[in-house]
UniProtKB/Swiss-Prot annotation:
Chain residues that bind ATP: 260-262, 347-350
Gene Ontology terms for molecular function: ATP binding; serine-tRNA ligase activity
InterPro entries, sorted: aa-tRNA-synt_IIb, aa-tRNA-synth_II, aa-tRNA-synth_II/BPL/LPL, Ser-tRNA-ligase_type_1, Ser-tRNA-synth_1_N, SerRS_1_N_sf, SerRS_core, tRNA-bd_arm
Family (UniProt): Belongs to the class-II aminoacyl-tRNA synthetase family. Type-1 seryl-tRNA synthetase subfamily.
Keywords of the record: Aminoacyl-tRNA synthetase, ATP-binding, Cytoplasm, Ligase, Nucleotide-binding, Protein biosynthesis
Quaternary organization: Homodimer. The tRNA molecule binds across the dimer.
EC number: 6.1.1.11
Cellular compartments annotated: Cytoplasm
Catalytic activity: tRNA(Ser) + L-serine + ATP = L-seryl-tRNA(Ser) + AMP + diphosphate + H(+); tRNA(Sec) + L-serine + ATP = L-seryl-tRNA(Sec) + AMP + diphosphate + H(+)
Gene: serS
Superkingdom classification of source: Bacteria
Cellular component GO terms held in the UniProt record: cytoplasm
Record-given protein name: Serine--tRNA ligase
Stated role: Catalyzes the attachment of serine to tRNA(Ser). Is also able to aminoacylate tRNA(Sec) with serine, to form the misacylated tRNA L-seryl-tRNA(Sec), which will be further converted into selenocysteinyl-tRNA(Sec).
Length: 422
């Protein structure tokens, strides 16, 4: 959430930078609500100061009739204050609800653009494999090996659900454990295993609510949501807390299943594992000081990249333009993995800095020093990685002409020493 004072003092800048997102923001409504709030606040404070002053005068009056008259006047003032404060609460709630719908201001270094066509390729890693045969997409590989069962997945739950079988289920589990071990043992993240359902406050804190409720799975009869990403519960671990500056940066990693309606994806990626209602993901989350956040973003991005480097799978890093970054993000880098069966790069991770946008919504602060005034932390997160899409990348990049799939060396200890799925 943006700070009302920041918007007020930087109206033209905020409006101009939000326009680069391709979203119009009702600045006139903000000015009206903010102006009314400040006016009512001033009226309330003026009358309260008057009441306090007269109360002190009454205590000094010797004339009881005069004191009674002044008390009557103050009862009227108190009624005025009550009415003004009720109006103030109403306006503050309206202003708060408005601010919750305003996206984050893109960082000034974020490339300006309208869509993914304007994103900037930062670097590529690895060579695209030159296969001596026509590569298959992962759904054909998985069905051919009997390790992915899309038909029975649909029978169990409908479209965009998959049943993993045998070596497919074990490969998914191997990827999860490999990613967790790498991030915990070498990158020094603290592992978390959060609830897979959260309350409305959590979803509001990270920015999914109120704007994107239709994309979420809501539990009927109770106000819980299935998590769309571990970002939601893990970021909210410190909701409403004041952290020690000496403890920053704090780095958490969490494996969770994720649940998404994919409401705007009708007709897209209808085959395979790319776009599912339920999928597994390993998430990286950081809490940092404002001064350190962009350095930590590069570290987080590097940690996510390392997963693919050790798997020896080609990828590229893309910086998202202002028209393509998410609602809460100030800057985002995507990692896109090469998929020979589809002859293209596909997103496998988004790594973002939200600056204080989420922290302000969730009330996450820190003290730079022991007795210093609390400040909002900066939050960061990124996939490290999306597990199903990593499995897709393994199947397509390690496929062999005979239909089998070689197992990357780093995964073999997690696969009982097996070298091939056939």
């Amino acid at each position: 959430m943006l700070d009302a004072r920041y918007i007020r003092e930087n109206l033209e800048t905020v409006e101009a930078r939000l326009k680069t997102r391709g979203e119009g923001v009702d600045i006139a409504l903000f000015k009206e609500l903010d102006g009314r709030r400040r006016e009512l606040l001033q009226q309330s404070e003026t009358l309260k100061a008057l009441r306090n002053k007269v109360t002190e005068e009454i205590a000094r009056l010797q004339d009881k009739s005069q004191a009674a008259e002044r008390k009557t006047e103050m009862r009227e003032v108190s009624q005025q204050i009550k009415g003004i404060d009720e109006s103030l609460r109403s306006v503050e709630e309206e202003l708060q609800n408005f601010l919750l719908t305003v996206p984050n201001v893109p960082n000034e270094t974020t490339p300006i653009g309208r869509s993914e066509e304007d994103n900037v390729v930062v670097r590529t890693w690895g060579e695209v494999p030159a296969l001596s045969f026509e590569p298959k997409p992962h759904w054909e590989i998985g069905e051919g090996l009997g390790i992915l069962d899309f038909e029975r997945g649909a029978k169990l739950a409908g479209a965009r659900f998959t049943l993993y079988r045998g070596a497919g289920a074990r490969l998914e589990r191997a990827l999860i454990n490999y990613m967790l071990d790498l991030h915990i043992d070498e990158h020094k993240y603290i592992e978390m295993l959060p609830p897979f359902m959260v309350n409305r406050e959590c979803m509001t804190g990270t920015g999914q609510l109120p704007k994107f409720e239709e994309d979420l799975f809501h539990m009927e009869g109770v106000d819980f949501f299935l998590i769309p990403t571990a970002e939601v519960p893990v970021t909210n671990i410190h909701r409403g807390e004041i952290l020690k500056g000496s403890d920053l940066p704090i780095s958490y990693v969490a494996y969770t299943p994720c649940f998404r309606k994919e409401a705007g994806s009708y007709g897209k990626d209808t085959r395979g594992l790319i776009r599912q209602h339920q999928f597994n993901k390993v998430e990286l989350v950081k809490f940092t000081s404002p001064e350190d956040s962009y350095e930590q973003l590069q570290k987080l991005l590097g940690h996510a990249e390392e997963v693919l480097r050790r798997l020896q799978i080609p990828y590229r890093v893309v910086e998202l333009c202002t028209g393509d970054i998410g609602f809460s993000a100030a800057k985002t880098f995507d990692i896109e993995v090469w998929l020979p069966g589809q002859n293209c790069y596909r997103e496998i991770s988004s790594c973002s800095c939200f600056e204080d946008f989420q922290a302000r919504r969730a009330g996450i602060r820190f003290r730079p020093e022991e007795k210093a005034k609390p400040e909002f932390v900066h939050t960061l997160n990124g996939s490290g990685l999306a597990v199903g899409r990593t499995l897709v990348a393994v199947l397509e990049n390690y496929q062999q002409a005979d239909g089998s799939v070689l197992i990357p060396e780093v995964l073999r200890p997690y696969m009982g020493g097996a070298e091939r799925i056939s």
